[in-house]
Structure formats: structure tokens, C-alpha cells
Amino acid sequence: MGQLGALLHLVDPTLPIGGFNHSNGLETFVQQGKVNSRASLEEYVQTQLMQNWIYNDGAYLSLAFDAMANHDLDRLLALDQELAASKIARESREGSYKLGVRLLKIFIRYENHPLLSEFQQAVSEKRCQGYFPIVFAMVAQAMNLDKAETLYAFYYNAAVGVVTNGVKLVPLSQMDGQDILFALRTPLAQAVENSLNPDLDWLGAATLASDIRSMQHEQLYTRLYMS
């Protein structure tokens, strides 16, 4: 039960890290009319999951989890730098490391793991940024969480964020949002399976439409979100 409690704490939407402030380009898709219904929002989330997250944030989380288990700080720093290079849009890039730094600040108070302290020192010395998936993986491994369950929780948390924002932006009913999350159960499980041992040849695969909308977000006339 202790691991379940730790995992629920790690993905608690009330964590004061500011995740609710970011749409990562979804707001642009909605304003351009690309996402305008339950069906299009569900398609958007599944596309992000299976064509973006499993090759980017999820893949780097998986690799960072293994590096943390091997007590390999150099590998963690390298993964953080590689992830930075894969995040083309400034708002999404800055949003990710701000979330990561805040997450680290919270959990370093509870987990007495030397690599967390060393990584925090590396962030303060600007040897890395501290991107959210990297920190998430480090904290999860420090708490001895199961890797597959950590990945599922990470993906589910990301999906909930997208659906919550989409319901607000389109707008849709709350039940539409719940129906989308229910439909994601099988794709989420498949994403976890694909991410346990990431294909390095696909690491950092670009999702151009999403990257472009994330960059266009900076120029929107009105915005509810920071990215």
C-alpha cells in the first residue's frame, strides 16, 4: 500500500507545480478549429500518446528510470540535455523544466536519495535544466515504484491534463471528458508496453503539427494557458 500512496502523491493534480497552466499547443488547435468536438479531442489525445509522448517524454522517462536505478548521474544529465534538444517550442520547453524543478523541490524533502541532491546541485550549477519527465522518473525510482506503473501514471496524468483543458476550451461536457478517458485505457496500456524498452532509433521523433501549434501559441491574441 505504501507504493500506491507514493505513486498517487507523485501524480496528485493538487501538487503546486503549475501543470494546469499548460496546454502544450492544444489551445492553438482549438482556436484554429482543428479540435472542436469530443471525437476530435479524443483523436488528438490518442495521437499525442502514440505518436509523441511514447517517443519523447515517456521514452526519456523510461531511460531516466533505468539510469536512476543504475546510479548513473552522467546518464541522467545527458538525457536531460537530449530532451531539451527535442523540445522545439520555447513555451513547452520552458514549461517542462519549470514543472520539473518544482517537482524536485517538493520530493527532495521526503526522499533521502543522494542522486536527487546531486541532480538538484547540477540544476543550480546550470549543468542541466531538470525537465519534468527526468525528475518524475528519478523521484519514482527513489521511491522504489514499479516502472510500468510509473509510466502508466505518467501517461494517464498527461492525458487527464489534455482532456481537462480540452473540455474547458472547446467546450465539452464533463461526461465527454470521462468517456474519452475511459476509451484511453487500452491505448495507455499499449503505450506503457512500448515505452518499457524504448527504441532509440525513434527517440525524439518530431510531431510537426504539434510543434508548430506550440510555437504559434506565443502569438495568439487571447490565451488562457502559458503554452
Swiss-Prot record:
Coarse class of the protein's main subcellular location: cytoplasm
GO molecular function: nickel cation binding
Entry's Gene Ontology cellular component terms: cytoplasm
Alphabetized Pfam families for the sequence: UreF
Key words, A-Z: Chaperone, Cytoplasm, Nickel insertion
Compartment(s) of residence: Cytoplasm
Assembly with partners or alone: UreD, UreF and UreG form a complex that acts as a GTP-hydrolysis-dependent molecular chaperone, activating the urease apoprotein by helping to assemble the nickel containing metallocenter of UreC. The UreE protein probably delivers the nickel.
Role played: Required for maturation of urease via the functional incorporation of the urease nickel metallocenter.
Family: Belongs to the UreF family.
Protein name in the entry: Urease accessory protein UreF
Classification lineage: Bacteria, Pseudomonadati, Pseudomonadota, Gammaproteobacteria, Pasteurellales
Gene name per UniProt: ureF
